[in-house]
Amino acid sequence: MVLALQGGMAVGKTTAARYVAAHDPAVAVFFEDNSPALSNLQGRGLDKHRFADYCEIQRAFIQQEIDRYDRAAACPCALIDLGPQEIEFYTLFYPASIGKDWPVRQALAAELAALRRCRIDRTLFLQASVSVLQQRKEGDTTRDRGFFDHTVQHLLPAKERWFAAQSRVDFCQPTILRKPKLLPQC
């Protein structure tokens, strides 16, 4: 069984994943780690605002996510902080958020098809108001959230709608859950 945590930036996905990792050793937790894709792309001078470069960047992130999913799927019970659905959403919707009308679906059809074969059994989409997300962002100096404003303004509303249209997705407001209640309810 592969479960995924989703939601906006600073909503508490990693905090929830850390809690599960600390309290249930039967669940293998796979944290977000972009270093494989970033090291593959480093020094190549790619610009995500150019279509060909964007496609190359997304190929690296899609492959990274497929590899991570394969490791998670080999476990009896796994939890992924973000996951293949996140990469699919971002790949398809980021260009429009910066005013581009690129044929991403066509250019990355094979990669997106491979990504969609990464079957998540259930996704928990954590939701919080923009003001709560802003407070959490400001309270966490350990993470670079330079993309936060763009994400909240241009991607999060579309992301919530996109995930609501997917099967096997549950929505939850983590502000109403206390840590001891989180694991038994999920």
Predicted regions and their residues:
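Pre-Walker A (Motif I) flank of P-loop NTPase domains
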Residues: 1-2, 76
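Hydrophobic anchor at the beta1->P-loop junction of P-loop NTPases
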Residues: 5
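P-loop (Walker A) phosphate-binding loop of NTP-binding proteins
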Residues: 8
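Conserved lysine of the Walker
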Residues: 13
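Conserved substrate/cofactor phosphate-moiety recognition/catalytic segment
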Residues: 18-67
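Short amphipathic alpha-helices and their capping/turn segments at secondary-structure boundaries
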Residues: 58-78, 109-115
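ATP-dependent NMP and nucleoside kinases share a basic, alpha-helical "lid"
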Residues: 80-142
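NTP-dependent small-molecule kinase module
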Residues: 138-186
